[in-house]
Amino acid sequence: MNILYIGSSAAFSLIPFKKLLASAYSISAVGVYKPLIFEHKVIALENESLALSAQQHAIPVIDLSLPVAELIEQISLLDIDLILMSCYSRRLPDDLINLAKAGCFNMHPSLLPRYRGPEPVFWQMKQAAEMGVSWHLVTHDLDAGDIVKQQKIKLDDGLSFEEINRSLANTGAELMLAVLADLSAQRLLKTTQDQALASYYPYPEKDDFTVDTSGSAQRAYNFMRATQVFGHVYHCDSAQHHFLLDEAIDYDNNASQASVDVQGNRLYIPFNEGVLIATYTGKLSS
């Protein structure tokens, strides 16, 4: 089975790629948008790169930024059976999708059809949603193709964005091997996505970095920890005050207090359920 693997240098793409490398399946080529490649050199990968990792394993790398006609010509020569894709942020041309005789499949970090879009982890953590990973057929409409594998995961408190993505990627990598096994045995089941349950979320904007004291301190803590990588302050209203929060330190869902307590650079903020402990920027307004 000739496989074209398309992705980026994020963990959500690299982890399944490494799983595929260690499997019995063969990767015919890797597709990356504007890859960084060094000819005839051995590179120490301090920061991992999908393109360089492929190159070090003698796997051809295809530049997906090429004109579509040139891209189709290159990939047609590989006689691709299957395209596997993870963490690739651009829409694939329909002509490229159609080159894969056994189908083109994408790994998405949510329980589709919920949380379609480019940053599903952000929105799931903001809304304290049930987390999971899905493999689905790639169609012209983003994240809307038939689901072939899906699994829920449970996350510990306080995980970073990278830790969450690694957890999702590890689960997704195992599901990928199950997809390949089912394809080989001609037993792959496809489930049409229920459009009535579908939701789509765009890239988050600065106004989306808010924490709501009507919820639980645990929810706010996990959201802030997971999204700190975006580098935004968090807006929080409590009583008559507006706070600009910097970092979530801890929470106590069993604690109860009437008002915000300031201790040094830390705020103890009462929520409907529990107390959030967070640092703040020093700017408070009444």
Region spans (language model):
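One-carbon transfer enzymes
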Residues: 1-230, 235, 263-278, 282-285
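A ubiquitous, low-specificity "background" feature that marks scattered single residues
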Residues: 171, 176, 241, 252-253
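Short, structured protein-protein interaction patches enriched in aromatics and acidic/basic residues
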Residues: 236-250
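A conserved acidic, glycine/proline-rich C-terminal tail/linker
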Residues: 247-262
